């Protein structure tokens, strides 16, 4: 007789494992199915390993600028294989901790590929094939890097890389091309440029980071260009050829050669061959599974979370969706709220944003005021030697409600949390500038930006009248 569970989760990425833990904590008998390692793309092939390498690149930057602090460093070198070894160690350590969490929550783990055979049964394909029954099912199958048309990622073309393969390089490329100027492309461009690579970013549109607001796109393009990154915009790549020790690219009819090429042109959803048709779950031509605000699909006992929902392709969104889905399965009535989703670009400098952008506000005909306060007027940033950049608040012109924000500069990834809380709770400008911010800290930039919105900044000359 097939074992039965209250909740079966297919996929143990940042959405799936969080959903499974939440379900188990609610007292549900829970199973988690994963064909690879717990943690999914984020932990094993994405967020965490890339940030481990970026941490090393940040140390390189600090050494290069050490003279500014009265510290002279002679003859340092980069041992890239050791950086990769550290990256792998970081991933292993976190994964071991995650596996311990899963065990401690008494979640039954099945190793293999999960596929629906009905709305209440899941087949597990692997070394020990089996079928389990489920009262409720959460689909959390994620996505994979999209290949360049006609050029699949394979061992036969080791110099043509996806975001997974580039993390396993054993050397720093002398000359590298990155096809795609989105978030992932720009993060790797920033990483390898900092480590000494000559990097060219090839982008089909007229701007990089095109899904963000134009101010971010232009500011980061200018910063990257000053740093020495090369961009080819409005570019058409008609051919990629691995010629052994090099890769040959044809860009706008011109032939260029590189040591490695990273293809970063988006991700494809893992909704094929998971039995959606057998369970009656609807998906569109892109593979997106529509859900309601409780993460329920068109089949009442089947939920979907993460990339396959077609919302934000962000680990923290998948995790929150997983919590919402599991709590609804456990009998709570909760709905997802996408009004305050923080987004971070881990480049040098960092970029973060949340809520409405000025462009979105204009499109929705919402009257807003955008105030940008520079880090050069923040004492802590100057003391750190990282005074480049700014923090901007988007507030309603009449009500002073904080509708969004974006920040380019030191520790932007951490700074955005304060304004995420403000947007989520519909706070107003006084809630920020009337709150005492510790001094000297980078977070003071938000108080100053909020004061600037009411024309009373403390550390900026008054506007000329």
UniProtKB/Swiss-Prot annotation:
Indicate the residues that form the catalytic site: 439
Is this entry keyworded Transmembrane?
no
- Residues annotated for FAD binding in this entry: 34-42, 51, 114, 307, 315
Binding note for cofactor = Binds 1 FAD per subunit.
What catalytic activity does the UniProt entry give for this protein? N(6)-[(R)-dihydrolipoyl]-L-lysyl-[protein] + NAD(+) = N(6)-[(R)-lipoyl]-L-lysyl-[protein] + NADH + H(+)
Record flagged with keyword Transmembrane:
no
SUPFAM superfamilies hit by this protein: FAD/NAD(P)-binding domain (SSF51905), FAD/NAD-linked reductases, dimerisation (C-terminal) domain (SSF55424)
Gene Ontology molecular-function annotations: dihydrolipoyl dehydrogenase (NADH) activity; flavin adenine dinucleotide binding
Q: What is this protein called?
A: Dihydrolipoyl dehydrogenase
**Highest taxon of source:** Bacteria
Task: Write out the GO cellular component annotations.
Answer: cytoplasm
Which major enzyme category is it? oxidoreductase
Q: What is its EC number?
A: 1.8.1.4
């Amino acid at each position: 007789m097939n074992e039965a569970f209250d909740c079966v989760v297919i996929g143990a990425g940042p959405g799936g494992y969080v959903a499974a833990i939440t379900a188990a904590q609610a007292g549900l008998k829970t199973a988690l199915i994963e064909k690879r390692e717990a943690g999914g793309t984020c932990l094993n092939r994405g967020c965490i390993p890339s940030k481990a390498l970026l941490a090393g690149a940040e140390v390189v930057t600090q050494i290069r600028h050490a003279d500014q602090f009265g510290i002279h460093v002679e003859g340092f070198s980069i041992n890239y294989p050791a950086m990769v070894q550290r990256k792998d160690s970081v991933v292993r350590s976190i994964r071991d901790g995650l596996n311990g969490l899963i065990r401690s929550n008494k979640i039954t783990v099945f190793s293999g590929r999960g596929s629906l055979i009905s709305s209440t049964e899941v087949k597990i394909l692997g070394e020990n094939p089996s079928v389990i029954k489920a009262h409720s099912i959460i689909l959390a199958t994620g996505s994979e890097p999209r290949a360049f048309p006609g050029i699949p990622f394979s061992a036969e073309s080791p110099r043509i890389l996806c975001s997974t393969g580039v993390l396993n390089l054993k050397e720093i490329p002398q000359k590298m091309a990155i096809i795609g100027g989105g978030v992932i492309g720009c993060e790797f461009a920033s990483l390898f440029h900092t480590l000494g690579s000559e990097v060219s970013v090839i982008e089909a549109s007229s701007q990089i980071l095109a899904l963000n607001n134009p101010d971010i796109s232009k500011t980061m393009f200018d910063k990257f260009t000053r740093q020495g990154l090369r961009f080819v915009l409005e570019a058409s790549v008609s051919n990629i050829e691995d010629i052994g020790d090099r890769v040959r690219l044809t860009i706008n009819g011109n032939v260029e050669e590189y040591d490695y090429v990273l293809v970063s042109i988006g991700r494809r959803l893992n909704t094929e061959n998971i039995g959606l048709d057998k369970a009656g779950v609807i998906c569109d031509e892109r593979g997106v599974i529509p859900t309601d605000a409780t993460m329920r699909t068109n089949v009442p006992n089947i939920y979907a979370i993460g990339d396959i929902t077609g919302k934000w392709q962000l680990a923290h969104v998948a995790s929150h969706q997983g919590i919402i889905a599991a709590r609804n399965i456990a009998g709570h009535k909760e709905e997802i709220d996408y009004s305050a989703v923080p987004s971070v670009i881990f480049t040098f400098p960092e970029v973060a944003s949340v809520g409405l952008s000025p462009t979105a506000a204009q499109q929705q005909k919402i009257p807003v005021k955008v105030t940008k306060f520079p880090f050069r007027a923040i004492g802590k940033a100057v003391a750190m030697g990282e005074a480049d950049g700014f923090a901007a608040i988007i507030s309603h012109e009449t009500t002073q409600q904080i509708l969004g924000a974006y920040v380019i500069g030191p520790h932007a990834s951490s700074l955005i949390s304060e304004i995420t809380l403000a947007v989520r709770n519909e706070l107003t400008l006084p809630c920020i500038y009337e709150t005492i911010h510790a001094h000297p800290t980078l977070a003071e930039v938000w108080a100053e930006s909020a004061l600037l919105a009411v024309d009373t900044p403390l550390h900026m000359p008054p506007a000329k009248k």
